[in-house]
Regions:
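His/Glu-rich zincin catalytic helix
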Residues: 1-82, 193-194
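Acidic/histidine-enriched segments that form metal/cofactor-coordinating
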Residues: 78-193
């Protein structure tokens, strides 16, 4: 790892320490005076926009919602268990979100920061799943998609995007559609995990 570089942001009175890790990931640390709670965020440049990309000059195309689906599945360990339970045992809260451009996994805790950080790095560093597990997750994501359809603010937002960017990935829900998530396979998820 390169040495930490300190940057001071006068307008918000914050110091940010940053470095590039040996694996190419960016690290940023912000020490918050007077705060007891600690948090860590791990982001990857893989979001809803990234369902068409080139590998070795060949176009790869995946169903809408693949990044969000992978976000869900990474919370499953090798035995099919929900890793959230491991964070709960440490007194930590863990979650994730997918945007158009990235997916972020994060946790916050008062104690056991190092152990929680190890868990975060472990569960985001490997992917294992079964077809049965993926099919089960499709039902969960389908419910999530339908829930957003009941939210007038979200429907207005998506309607604006659909009007501004018709027939593009921007006119689709970040989670995809009920139809698009039905197309997602274990192989699709593994291919995208390996790529990003």
């Amino acid at each position: 790892m390169a040495a930490l570089k300190k940057r001071y942001y006068q307008k918000i009175d914050e110091e940010v320490y940053s470095a590039i890790l040996d694996n190419g990931m960016s690290l940023s640390i912000i020490k918050k005076k007077g705060f007891v709670e600690k948090a860590a965020f791990l982001s990857t440049n893989f979001g809803a926009l990234d369902n068409h990309f080139y590998i070795d000059g060949e176009l790869q195309s995946y169903p809408a919602g693949i990044a969000h689906f992978l976000e869900h599945k990474l919370f499953e360990d090798e035995q099919g268990r929900d890793v959230t339970l491991d964070f709960v045992k440490l007194g930590a809260d863990v979650n994730a979100f997918t945007t158009l451009e990235k997916t972020t996994y994060y946790f916050s805790t008062l104690d056991h920061f190092e152990e929680s950080l190890e868990l975060l790095l472990k569960f985001t560093s490997s992917f294992t799943s079964s077809e049965d597990s993926v099919n089960h997750e499709k039902r969960i994501i389908e419910q999530e998609i339908n829930m957003y359809q009941d939210d007038p603010d979200y429907r207005a937002y998506l309607g604006c995007l659909q009007s501004l960017y018709p027939n593009t990935i921007l006119d689709q829900d970040i989670a995809g559609s009920v139809d698009s998530i039905e197309e997602i396979t274990v192989k699709d998820l593994k291919d995208n995990f390996d790529c990003f």
